[in-house]
Regions:
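A beta-strand edge to alpha-helix "cap/lid" segment located at domain peripheries
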Residues: 1-2, 50-129
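Short, low-complexity N-terminal intrinsically disordered segments enriched in polar/charged residues
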Residues: 1-26, 30, 121-129
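A solvent-exposed, acidic/Ser-Thr-rich amphipathic alpha-helical stretch
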Residues: 4-8, 21-72
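Alpha-helix C-capping/helix-to-loop hinge sites
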Residues: 13, 34-35, 77
């Protein structure tokens, strides 16, 4: 699959991730693996993570920040908000087999204020949070 098609599939995935789990999960192979290293969770088989996402107890919003990759490995940087709360930063590392995702690792974190002691080395432009 060409890079433009993969990018379009990833955009579609996040556009529907908060509203339609059937469409959002079209991107995965049936035997796909989803991991959250921060919580130590691993889900094997798309049906397992699609089902808990259907009943997720918070209203989610996603904002795509950047998608980059080539070949079978892609990285997506997103922002996510739970129930209209503060935005968290996410990084997803996605491995493709053919035209579908076979493995995804998601890292989620909150932004933090830059420490003053690093200021003299820091570029003065601001990275969007």
């Amino acid at each position: 699959m060409d890079e433009a098609s993969i990018r379009a599939r990833l955009v579609r995935h996040w556009e529907y991730s908060a509203t339609d789990q059937d469409i959002a999960h079209e991107i995965y192979h049936e035997d796909a693996v989803l991991e959250f290293p921060q919580s130590g969770e691993r889900f094997v088989g798309v049906q397992n993570f699609r089902e808990w996402r259907r009943i997720y107890p918070a209203k989610l919003e996603f904002e795509i920040r950047r998608i980059t990759g080539s070949g079978s490995v892609w990285v997506a940087e997103n922002s996510i908000s739970y129930d209209g709360g503060p935005w968290n930063l996410t990084v997803s590392i996605l491995e493709f087999r053919g035209d579908k995702v076979t493995h995804e690792r998601i890292y989620i974190t909150q932004p933090w204020d830059a420490p003053g002691w690093r200021a003299r080395w820091r570029d003065q432009s601001v990275v969007a949070r």
